[in-house]
């Protein structure tokens, strides 16, 4: 495994903190804070912050620092509904060329998720990321993979709300839709696989809408 660079370590650390809800919407991060937190020089911190801005997680505010981008309910819904379009299209494209090895890898990823019962937001979100990005990668669209990765990264700004609410209401899928997608692919039932993939993506939308209505 290739050794993680300092920039990558800082990026991952900040991204993990946003995902876990340690840094919330509109919080301001400064270069000096991050230098102290990660014990590195200014250069990797500045590079990581710039990349987080490019990925839509932070916004650079001159003379203040870097603000965690606020996310609106409409933006959440737009991202999730666009993911449905992208991921279902990718699955239908890859379906004719899926191999037994591909499906076995998907099952391994899905079962690893369902077997883990820890309630750490970042770890659960990373497992979810691994399943969706691997599944989409099977259609061999490199540009689409990069776009999906960026969309999922942008979801980190609100995903802690989903997990904390779903765990409290005992409503988190814990990977069951991922298992259902793999089962359907093994049966060569593309329509059923797409149905469960859509349910998995939109489960976040439904939970966020429920949480929003409760807080109104």
Q: Language-model segments: which ranges?
A:
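Juxtamembrane/interface motifs at transmembrane-helix termini
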Residues: 46-47, 97-100, 124-127, 165-169, ...
């Amino acid at each position: 495994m290739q050794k993680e660079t300092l920039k990558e370590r800082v990026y991952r650390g900040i991204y993990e903190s946003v995902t876990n809800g340690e840094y919330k919407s509109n919080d301001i991060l400064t270069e000096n804070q991050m230098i102290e937190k990660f014990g590195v020089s200014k250069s990797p911190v500045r590079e990581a912050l710039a990349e987080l801005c490019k990925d839509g997680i932070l916004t650079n505010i001159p003379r203040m620092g870097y603000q965690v981008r606020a996310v609106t309910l409409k933006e959440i819904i737009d991202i999730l509904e666009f993911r449905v379009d992208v991921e279902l299209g990718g699955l239908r494209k890859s379906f004719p060329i899926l191999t037994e090895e591909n499906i076995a890898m998907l099952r391994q990823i899905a079962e690893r998720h369902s077997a883990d019962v820890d309630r750490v937001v970042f770890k659960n979100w990373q497992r979810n990321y691994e399943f969706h990005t691997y599944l989409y990668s099977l259609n061999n669209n490199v540009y689409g993979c990069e776009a999906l990765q960026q969309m999922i990264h942008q979801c980190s700004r609100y995903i802690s709300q989903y997990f904390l609410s779903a765990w409290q209401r005992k409503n988190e899928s814990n990977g069951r839709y991922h298992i259902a997608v793999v089962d359907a692919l093994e049966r060569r039932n593309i329509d059923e696989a797409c149905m469960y993939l859509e349910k998995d993506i939109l489960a976040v939308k439904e939970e966020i809408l429920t949480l929003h209505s409760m807080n109104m």
